[in-house]
Amino acid sequence: MGRNVLLSSLQNASFSIVFQIICRCITFAINAFIVRNVGREVLGITNVRLLLLESTLLFLSKEAIQRSALSSRHNKQCTWAQLINQLWITVPVCFTLAIPCLYIWLHWLSAVDAVYAEQYRFGCFAIAFSCIIEMTAESPIFVGQVFCFVKLKVILDTGHIFIRSFIFITIVLLNKDITIYAFGIAQITSACTIIVGNYAFYYFYIPRLLRYRDELKKVDDKRVLREKYGQQYENMEDFPFVSIRQMLPGVLPNPGSMFNSDLQTLVLSFAKQGILKQVLTEGEKYVMSVSPVLTFSEQATYDVVNNMGSLAARFIFRPIEDSSYFYFTQSISRDTPLAEQRQSAVQEASDVLAYVTKTVTSIGLLAFVFAQSYAGPVLLLYGGADFVEGGLPELLLRWHSLAIVLLALNGITEGYMFATNTSRQIDTYNYYMAFFSVTFLLLSYQLTNWFGPVGFILANCCNMSFRIGYSVFYVGKQFRQVGPNPLLRSLPGPLYLSVLGVCGVLCKLSEAYFAGRSILWHLLVGVLCTAASVASWSFENRQLLRTGMARYRARKQSITTSADER
């Protein structure tokens, strides 16, 4: 198999960053439209309560199965037929989970105003239905991930976001009183788009791949076929499907049992961990929903600020985390000590872990420093004067920038740990996750009573600090047998930290001088200081940038050369 995992991971990260930027820009525009024209209470119902239902169902239904399937496929622990059967379990799992979740969302959580009651009920059922039907696309989505169809994922994800947004905005413009109805309809439509898009691709791809294989036996020069078919059909000798029907359960020939016991054991381990991780990820929304600490209007304010504060996480950190996790699962074996694995792969994984951690930590510090001076102007431009009145949004965004630094470090270190843990280690960590989850919920409730919405952010910082500590200990213990801890090379350099500190002081002086005079000049100072900070980081890490670009070009050239030789 000639596919390159590291190159695919890099491509996936770059394409995903572009997609996340497009997605977040659209979402931010829609949120700003709702805040200015419909009201924050409706935004609180849709973005907090209904999206929490979607997040709960999707995460608990597929996260454990998807992660275990990726690891099992790399280690050749099960057949493709067993993987497909396992992936289709997500449909009945999602349906089963939807029943109690709907009852809780409709009867147990704090009630919405009577004027929105019917729309809210429809929205809950629409979210549940969209999640269930979306699970039917897990099989082709997984195949695309394994065989590195990076552009397919980005195109389909971008397309369904545009379709969902277009339908939602069109309905709201026609009648802004049915915004929640529009939200539910748009969610169902986007789920259908995901299903149709993924299956349609393989409906056309598989027949062309079969013709490509037939012609490949008759020609000596693969360049002729590349000009005719393109590169997406090369190095696909291990693609197991000859019909789109084989992506359905029980259709692909299977000499063994329907399900793999080792895979199911790994699924159970990830499932226990997934429940706890979901509580940690969406804990503040669960607290807001279960206990009426904040009104829907205040929930919307927190959600808007939280999303804005998570720009770096959504644009950069999450795509890098996903690609890094995929790379580590394909490079490092879970059940074999590092000393017994191929040392070139271990060294490469060590370098990737160190460089990626250093990069995201530097980005997090950049966001923290500049948020102290630019939280107010950014929120004013986004939501208007009424939105920032009272100072709560600005205060939340400044505190949230602290969480970004911890989020950056936690995402990579924890991702590496999850990618290389054995089933036993995952089970052990689940006990710690249980402790972290309970502590996080208790801290969220208590700190919110003391500090208001800021308490959610402080509780999240404490939680991530606990998780970072555990991950750092794991990485150090694992690499002790093969060399130095790669995380020791992940701290930003003194030049970058010094320039960043000076720029932070200059921006605070700019804020004090230009406050109420000229936002434009204040923003210009920020742009110049950001450029200086990025330039100092690039200069200090110039060897890293050269190595990364050289390695990327070399691997890309090796793939092209090997393809030409075939």
Regions found by a protein language model. Give the residues of each.
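Signature of the first transmembrane helix
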Residues: 2-66, 93-98, 102-111, 123-126, ...
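Membrane-interface helix-capping segments at transmembrane helix termini in multi-pass transporters
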Residues: 6-7, 38-46, 72-88, 95-132, ...
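Transmembrane helical elements of multi-pass membrane transporters/channels
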Residues: 12-27, 183-202, 214-330, 359-362, ...
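Short runs within selected transmembrane alpha-helices of multi-pass transporters and secretion channels
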Residues: 23, 27-31, 47-54, 58-69, ...
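Helix-loop junctions and terminal segments of transmembrane helices
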Residues: 27-31, 59-77, 146, 305, ...
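Membrane-proximal transmembrane or re-entrant/amphipathic helices at the cytosolic face
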Residues: 58, 205-253, 293, 476-494, ...
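Interfacial segments at transmembrane-helix termini and the short loops linking adjacent helices
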Residues: 106-127, 354, 367-409, 418, ...
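Hydrophobic alpha-helical transmembrane segments
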Residues: 121-125, 154-250, 258, 262-266, ...
